Amino acid sequence: MSKSEFQVIIVGGSIGGLTLAHCLRRAGIDHIILEKSSSPAPQIGASIGILPNGARILDQLQLWSEVEDYIEPLSTATIGLPDGFSFSSSYPQIINERFGFPIAFLDRQLLLEILYQRYPDRSKIRLEEKVTAVETSDSGATVTTSNGSVYRGGLVVGADGVHSIVRREIWRASKKLSSGLTAEFRCIFGISSAIKGLNVGEQVNALFDGLTIVTIHGKNGRVYWFVIQKLDKKYIYPNCPRYTKHDTTVAAEQLRNIQFYRDITFGQVWENRETASMTVLEENTFKTWHYGRLVLLGDSVHKMTPNIGQGANMAIEDAAALTNLLHNLQKISGTLSSTAAQIETILRQYRRIRYERVESIYRDSRFLVRFQARDGLLNILLSRYYAPYAGDLPADMASKTIADGVMCDFLPPPKRSGDGWKRYRRDGQLRGWRFHAMLCILMLAILYTWVGRTNLDSIVFSACGSLFQKLSVPT
């Protein structure tokens, strides 16, 4: 297959899929997107958090300036507990200052619209093309859609989400049939118009037992919100609950009277809703990322809860990392070879580059959703007796996660930046902090049984502070 014949077939016009198309276009690599929806930017009531590691890539692709028109950078986060105790952190503002890009939220629909409208050749984005079959061989890959169209290329990328047909074919072909995808939480999510008392640029995290209410207050007071609840048991994919609009309404009405911030109730958020939906929150990072000429990115291969805000950013990074490898092969060889051996080498490198980072962030996400839902005694203790006194620790931990992000190495780095990229980069040292965290948790349990809850405020902070302080020192 000659260079002119090599084509990347992207299954799914998701944020990851459209970002990959922009990356491939800038790298001069032929591609096409097959999207099952009739609209490139459907409104499903979801919001998207863009963190500096994702924003930096969008800036390289000359898309960030348009995204900025729709966002209000976060400056403050307030955390509230069931006993009425609350505290605030300026970690969002610190992140902005360190990296030159903010933590910000906007409608998922708006980001998709920007990615679609700013793509210059719409003929490469095929709507209403539902993929029904995917095949891979030594000589190429074939994709068939529901209308009978057949597409042939050198590589198929599954950017088709948690129910990925490309992943299903990888499992079948590689005989890896155990998914490992589980769900222990569900989420009601939506977008509401402005509510008096919820100030622009602020975020509220209200932590209850088995329940978390998160509101992010964006441009013009627009409220992006999540209500995360612990399920009655652990579900294993694909046998997870599916929810109707009626289910969403019933679940939301049951929470109507909960005061989550000062005198503001969830009922006020619900009454002001523009869109809302409910879904289970699947969790997993799959170990198998590719087979033959098939490869995965985004939610199709790593699914995490929204608490950490890195889901879309990981998909954006995946797109950049995969394009980097294809571009390097093209630069070295002068062509994109379609030999199975070279494709296999590229995909092995892609998985090796991405897996450890994604797995680390996935584990952070697993911890955070349980911490914010006060799931278990240890998380109750941490939320009440350590988190309020952690100072800049949340910003320092987030900085290390952000600084390790990849970008498009075939494009100039953004002109806007901050010293955080170099200062907090860990060069692959992703696991060290967990030892200290687990040790601190163990100490908390011992202290709890030793002194009881009465004196924990001072003792726990004193005993654990030195351990967590190690996390604040850039490596």
From Swiss-Prot:
Alphabetical UniProt keywords: FAD, Flavoprotein, Glycoprotein, Membrane, Monooxygenase, Oxidoreductase, Transmembrane, Transmembrane helix
Gene Ontology molecular function terms on file: FAD binding; monooxygenase activity
Subcellular location: Membrane
Named cofactor requirement(s): FAD
Binding residue positions for FAD: 35, 49, 108, 299, 312
Cellular component aspect of the GO annotation: membrane
TM region positions: 8-24, 432-451
Known EC number: 1.-.-.-
Keyword Transmembrane: yes
Pfam short name (any one): FAD_binding_3
Highest taxon above the source species: Eukaryota
Associated pathway: Secondary metabolite biosynthesis
Membrane topology type: Multi-pass membrane protein
Positions annotated as glycosylated: 147
Cited function: FAD-dependent monooxygenase; part of the gene cluster that mediates the biosynthesis of the indole diterpenes janthitremanes such as shearinine K or shearinine A. The geranylgeranyl diphosphate (GGPP) synthase janG catalyzes the first step in janthitremane biosynthesis via conversion of farnesyl pyrophosphate and isopentyl pyrophosphate into geranylgeranyl pyrophosphate (GGPP). Condensation of indole-3-glycerol phosphate with GGPP by the prenyl transferase janC then forms 3-geranylgeranylindole (3-GGI).
Family to which the UniProt record says this protein belongs: Belongs to the paxM FAD-dependent monooxygenase family.
UniProt name for this protein: FAD-dependent monooxygenase janM
Naturally occurring in which organism (per UniProt): Penicillium janthinellum
Lineage of origin: Eukaryota, Fungi, Dikarya, Ascomycota, Pezizomycotina
Gene encoding the protein: janM
